């Protein structure tokens, strides 16, 4: 968790989970925020027409884990147990490579927020601006990143049994959802994008809970200033 505890706590920690992930979120005042080790930064980005940007990961985390692990028994176990959490194309590829039957027809998509890993000597906000440009083709001139607060997220992936850490920042853009769609070019990280209307974030999904939590953090930080 680094030294984020030195920043003032804004909200009580909250834990959300589904069949794939378990996420613990803690909101802090921004203050001095520096990355002391490799981690990822994500942006909870709201459009000018009150929608939040959702990214469709090019390869699911599960597919990437099976494809790159050198442990053959692990490959087989993960495929047999969790292959319904992959796209049809991913299952077809691994079914062929592992000589295992494909027993599902569910076209699962990993929904994530724009962002990525911090590079050496890169600030947290610069990392997010770079990632949004790379993934969504949106320049920094269209972005306003909230620097009053941040959310630390500890993510446990139930499928691949691994932990990840992220810093989430709230971002507003003066582009509409249609303009973002028109700018978007599929890339090696993100194959597509979609949006959820701000009026629909009370639906009980993992990503809507993340959105609601950071909105609450932004409102709390504004009321404290």
Curated annotation (Swiss-Prot):
A motif (Nudix box) lies at residues 116-137. It is an enzyme of class 3 (hydrolase). Induction: Expressed in the late phase of the viral replicative cycle. Keywords: Hydrolase, Magnesium, Manganese, Metal-binding. The keyword Repressor does not apply. SUPFAM superfamilies: Nudix. Mn(2+) binds at residue 135. Residues 35-218 form the Nudix hydrolase domain. GO terms for molecular function: hydrolase activity; metal ion binding. PROSITE patterns: NUDIX, NUDIX_BOX. Its EC number is 3.1.3.-. The keyword ATP-binding does not apply. Mg(2+) binds at residues 122, 157. Its cofactor is Mg(2+); Mn(2+). Gene3D superfamilies: Nucleoside Triphosphate Pyrophosphohydrolase. The active site is at 131 (nucleophile). Belongs to the Nudix hydrolase family. Decapping enzyme required for the removal of the 5'-end m7GpppN cap tethered to viral and host mRNAs to allow their decay in cells. May therefore accelerate viral and cellular mRNA turnover to eliminate competing host mRNAs and allow stage-specific synthesis of viral proteins. Acceleration of the turnover of cellular transcripts may even promote the shutoff of host protein synthesis. This is mRNA-decapping protein D10. It comes from Fowlpox virus (strain NVSL) (FPV).
């Amino acid at each position: 968790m680094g030294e984020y505890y030195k920043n003032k706590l804004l909200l009580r920690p909250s834990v959300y989970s589904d069949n794939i992930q378990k996420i613990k979120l803690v909101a802090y005042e921004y203050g001095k925020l520096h990355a002391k080790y490799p981690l990822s930064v994500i942006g909870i980005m709201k459009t000018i027409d009150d929608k939040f940007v959702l990214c469709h990961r090019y390869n699911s985390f599960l597919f990437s884990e099976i494809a790159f692990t050198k442990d053959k028994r692990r490959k087989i176990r993960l495929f047999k147990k969790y292959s319904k959490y992959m796209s049809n194309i991913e299952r077809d590829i691994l079914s062929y490579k592992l000589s295992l039957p494909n027993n599902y027809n569910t076209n699962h998509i990993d929904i994530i927020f724009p962002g990525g890993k911090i590079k050496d000597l890169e600030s947290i906000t610069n990392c997010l601006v770079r990632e949004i440009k790379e993934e969504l083709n949106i320049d920094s001139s269209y972005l306003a990143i909230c620097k009053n607060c941040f959310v630390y997220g500890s993510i446990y992936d139930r499928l691949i049994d691994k932990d990840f850490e992220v810093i989430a920042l709230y971002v507003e853009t003066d582009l509409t959802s249609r303009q973002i769609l028109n700018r978007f070019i599929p890339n090696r990280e993100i194959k597509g994008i979609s949006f959820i209307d701000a009026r629909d974030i009370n639906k009980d999904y993992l990503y809507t809970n993340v959105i609601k939590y950071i909105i609450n953090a932004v409102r709390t930080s504004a009321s404290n200033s």
